[in-house]
Amino acid sequence: MATTVPDPDAGLEPTFAAPPQACDAHFHVFGPAGRYPYGSDLRYAPPQAPLSEYLKLAGRLGFVRFVFVQPSAYGFDNSCMFDAMDELDPAVRRAIVDLDETKATDAQLADWHARGVRGIRVNISPVRQPEAGLSQSMLPRIARLAAICRELGWHLDFLTPGWLVSELMPMLRELPIGFTVAHFGLYPAKDGVKQPGFQGFLKLVNDGSQRCYVKLTGIYRFSLAPGFADVTPFARALIQTVPDQLIWGSDYPHLSFHDKVGTIGLYNKLGEWAPDPAARQRILVDNPARLFGFA
């Protein structure tokens, strides 16, 4: 049964003002289970997190542009997300879908593009352990999805554990379209920024093509330190290296962490990583506007 989302942000206020046209580039909505049934790959007990609750929080932070991301709980059924999108002005909303590329029709894809879809998610559980052959088995589907994205001007949105990002690196270097990588690439923060996986990731992101954008999201999924202090070196390395290829997202409603982590607290971390307002302007406004086509 869905549970009500508590408010870990109670008593907190933003430590900096969001710039005009700020974008939350990664969040989810969940509706009543009776109306929006969950798929077979249920990794967590989904909280009930309707758009109305999210918008209250977004209003406190100053976000006026929104990128919905299809959660794994709904599989290929994007209807909960689309219904929520219909409540917003099309000019301020975009979306990342999940889909069965073997069944998607040209008409369906064109309709989704008109509704604001700009990417397709490649989603492997962040806690999945190294598995021989997994990365190779993913390549045919990624190629099919990339062909769809290339035709429509979309990008691929990768959420995979860090070990899998590294195994996919040869493919990512040659991917003929733009792509995003969620949650800093999910490299364990305890291993530091000098770990070979993250150094290889930095090299990929900074290859000069500007194909790869990194989402400064989900830090509670790879950090074990109090206050997520061990994430700061990762954030600053990315901000110093590729400031024009970073976007920020709340990852609301934080799913299995929803009773422990608050969005305002996470937003305030960005102020610590990027004390320069010009850097935050890029991360919250300029970069997502370029990537998602906000006017």
What are the functions of these language-model segments?
Residues 26, 58, 81, 112, ...:
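Conserved, mostly hydrophobic/aromatic
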Residues 22-27, 66-69, 93-97, 120-122, ...:
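Hydrophobic faces of well-ordered beta-strands that scaffold small-molecule active sites
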Residues 32-47, 129:
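Acidic/histidine-rich helix-loop elements
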Residues 2-6, 10, 75-163, 215-220:
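Active-site gating/metal-coordination segments in enzymes
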